[in-house]
Amino acid sequence: MTILDEATCWDLLSTAAVSRLAVVVGDDLEIFPINTVVDGRTIVFSTGEGTKLAAVTIARNVVVEADGHDDATGEAWSVVVKGEADRLDRFDDIDKAEQLPLRSWSTHPKQWFVRVKPRSITGRRFAVSAG
């Protein structure tokens, strides 16, 4: 296993097709799949009304995780970002977010943007077992 430096973590995170968002909802932890885009040293995703939006608005501490693998090299990676989520509500912030190359897998309407400002980012690369 190799511990990744911050620059490599951001590079890998920018290639992830889907990430996972972990939030506290009441007394429970919830994990949601999200499509993300790296914007500078932040992560942006879009969402519709519902539990995910309510959770990041009330309890802004979140964890974003993404991973991937390379069949050619037999290696996999995982990046974890711990940070604070901000729902974008200023018109110029929303306008900038709408210009980002954020592609959603879902056809569900997603009219809100959220930016995660990291407190920490860590990553690992490791060999995938043959079994």
Question: What function would you assign to each model-found segment?
Answer:
Residues 1-20:
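Short, basic/aromatic recognition patches
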Residues 14-16, 28-29, 78, 107-109:
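Short solvent-exposed loop/turn micro-motifs enriched in small/polar/acidic residues
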Residues 27, 51-53, 130:
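Short, surface-exposed beta-strand-loop junctions and turns on beta-sheet-rich folds
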Residues 45-46, 64, 123:
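Short hydrophobic/aromatic-rich beta-strand segments that constitute the beta-sheet cores
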Residues 113-130:
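Charged phosphate-binding loop/patch that engages nucleotide di/tri-phosphates or the phosphate backbone
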